[in-house]
Amino acid sequence: MDFRKLFLHSSLLVLHFAFSSSKDTITINQTIHDGDFLISRENNFALGFFSPGSSRFRYLGIWFRKVREQTVVWVANRDDPINGSSGVLSIDQYGNLVLHSYHNLKVPVWSTNVSVEATDTCVVAQLLDTGNLVLFDDRSKSTVWESFDHPTDTMLPGMKLGLDRRTGMNRFLISWRSAADP
């Protein structure tokens, strides 16, 4: 095999692994657009945009990855859906996960609403194999926000429900309004 063929085969192999590997994190300089996904390390869960049932609206959610029928376990913007496929998820300068419509990047549709001063490499969002979306400080590894503290309609192993007397946080499940409206 000559050098050119070896180079071509090696390049194709590298490209295959580069594009077939999924990412489970985003940082302050990255975005997730409608059509992009975060995939947990062991492929148990996916985070991305979806339209439930016959709805024309788009939601940011987490669902089981290894189940044939999409089974959503968490929804970020259930009260404020996005019209069309214009959703963008990012981390803002304050360390919040922020969901915008591409048509209006100034007004967030949904946010984690935490108050952490972020720097370029400080805050990371990661989708864990438990289905928990965690926002953490990359330096101290301390959790800033997690989806398990804000459940929607599904209880997953590791979640806690009820009142946390120390923090005052009350966690509870709320059913979907219909198959097309989470």
Q: Would you name each region that the model predicts?
A:
Residues 2-182:
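Beta-rich ligand-binding surfaces for carbohydrates and other polyanions
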